[in-house]
Amino acid sequence: MIEPNYLPFILIGGGIIFVVLFFHYVPFFLWLSAKVSGVRISLVQLFLMRIRNVPPYVIVPAMIEAHKAGLSNITRDELEAHYMAGGHVEKVVHALVSASKANIELSFQMATGIDLAGRDVFEAVQMSVNPKVIDTPPVTAVAKDGIQLIAKARVTVRANIRQLVGGAGEDTILARVGEGIVSSIGSSENHKSVLENPDSISKLVLRKGLDAGTAFEILSIDIADIDIGRNIGAALQIDQANADKNIAQAKAEERRAMAVALEQEMKAKAEEARANVIQAEAEVPKAMAEAFRSGNLGIMDYYRMKNIQADTSMRENIAKPETTFGNEPLSK
């Protein structure tokens, strides 16, 4: 049984706990702020938000902002559903208010769809009002005269809200602009015409409709800078000349090797013929002896042949060139 002396303290403690729980589950001051702002919402609805794990401090300020901006068609249930789907309620309401003030057509369904697709819908609306400037990386291209040009461009784009869901992003814009610059410079007769009229590149690229299928609308393309690079044509000609020279040297080396091989083959054949001659000369004494035995060769015939051999040897010695050793001529 509770002592009478402790009863006031228990009642005070219970009252404090009740007040804390009440203000936790029922944000009274938030409800009061909504009432003052003209937003119709009950304490029961705020309590049910807590039960559904929907923070009232996200939904109610968004409702107040929409009501003050004249967007009375946005309901509490729609905001709760968008929050529970993982969306950003504050950004969606900010975007709708900005679009309404800028006379941009944007419905709640479109805004929530853009937000759930992972796009920043508020930034998209801001970009529709204030176009964004994108600087392209250096684009390298070669004119028909072989001179390399390095161009930098600035692309002014505006968000196309209707294409934000499923439309390509900035990377696609940069890639298409770079492709257009390369095509424009590559079709120029010489690099001087590009340097004299850089706006011709912008006009040609804009006519191609590079923003088709993207989340942006290209407003202008301005060539910020053009630098002259290497002489690619001359470099290619030098490389081709070096390649032709290497091929000619390889063919000449091949012909030289074939000539050396043929020379060695001829030397081998000459040595073979010389060996055959020596072998045939070795058979001469045998034939002469056989001729003496058979009586086909007489003594006078033998001496006559020896005289002929001596004359032949003398002529060969006379015909041989003299070699010198120091100042003394030597005969082999």
Curated annotation (Swiss-Prot):
Species in which this protein is naturally found: Phocaeicola vulgatus (strain ATCC 8482 / DSM 1447 / JCM 5826 / CCUG 4940 / NBRC 14291 / NCTC 11154) (Bacteroides vulgatus)
Similarity remark: Belongs to the flotillin-like FloA family.
Quaternary assembly: Homooligomerizes.
Cited InterPro entries: FloA
Keyword Nucleotide-binding attributed: no
Membrane protein topology class: Single-pass membrane protein
Keywords: Cell membrane, Membrane, Transmembrane, Transmembrane helix
Transmembrane parts of this sequence: 9-29
The protein's name in its UniProt record: Flotillin-like protein FloA
Its job: Found in functional membrane microdomains (FMM) that may be equivalent to eukaryotic membrane rafts. FMMs are highly dynamic and increase in number as cells age. Flotillins are thought to be important factors in membrane fluidity.
Any single Gene Ontology cellular-component annotation: membrane raft
Primary location recorded for the protein, binned into one broad class: membrane
Compartments where located: Cell membrane; Membrane raft
